Amino acid sequence: MKQNVLISIPAFNEEKHISIILNQLSAFKKYVLVVNDGSTDNTEQLIRVSGFTYISNSINWGITEFYKTSLEYAIKNNYTHMITLDSDGQHDPSYVEDFMKKLEHFDLIVGNRFTDLSIIPESKIASNLFAALLSRKIHGIILPDVACGFRGMKISSVFGGYRIEAFGVVYDMLFRFVKSGSQVGYVNIPAIYHPSDVYATKIDEIVSLLNVARQYIDWSVLEKILVKIIKRKDFKLRLFGYDFRAQYLDSKEYLFSTDLIKATAYYDQFKTNPQFQLL
């Protein structure tokens, strides 16, 4: 399948990591596209020297434009599938082949970073579970990780007409695939976090998720949460028996928390229940 899969990578001021990532993808060089998204450091020069194909934007357009640019390039060059991964070192390129294999059976593959919770900060576990369960409420899909940017997908009409801005496109893409009846799976990938670090969630990311969710479900609770966020207040939400608390921080971020024992049980089901063992 390799010859039909475009590997597209967004890069914004990644001079510290981009050469390492591209070197690890040398075996797939002719299938790789780098989208230099308005970098102001030496990222573009390093990509040029590497000899990889790239497109440069004069300003930083963000993730929605990245997907649009990548899809247009893929269609123009007759690719049937696409894999995306970040250029900041958080996604291990050695897993690209795992995504390619899974794409032979699924329409969308999302990377799952939550196989070893001992190396993931509790706040990150809570915020990811919040997004996963909200996605379940919308479409009934049960996945361990719904926000990972390391993903593979079949290029289809599902992608048409994106109007979602900022991080919301990551969720909208998933919801569109599920709504269309596509087969969605996941690939386990390593998480690169330090468990003692505190990972707060940016307000823009939360608002993006909630705004996309509102397009698929009529639930007044989401409106109430958005009002609290606008007022920079803490909020709580209960989803499928899991209680979430989000504390507003002065840095315009929220710190999520939940019952870690229950959260661990949620993620363990993907290890023990054959229904979820998609690898």
Task: Show the residue positions of the predicted features.
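Short loop->beta transition adjacent to catalytic acidic/histidine clusters or analogous donor-positioning motifs
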Residues: K2-V5, L25-V34, N42
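A conserved acidic beta->alpha catalytic loop
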Residues: N36-E44, G89
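Acidic helix N-cap motif at the loop->helix transition within catalytic regions
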Residues: K16-I20, D41-V49
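Acceptor/aglycone-binding surface of glycosyltransferases and processive sugar-polymer synthases
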Residues: I59-Y73, P93-F167, H194-I203
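Hydrophobic helical membrane-anchoring modules
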Residues: M1, I164-L279
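Short hydrophobic beta-strand elements that form part
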Residues: L6-P10, S56
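Short beta-strand-to-loop acidic/aromatic patch adjacent to the donor-nucleotide binding site
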Residues: Y79-Q90
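Short, well-formed alpha-helical segments that are part of the catalytic scaffolds
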Residues: F12-A27
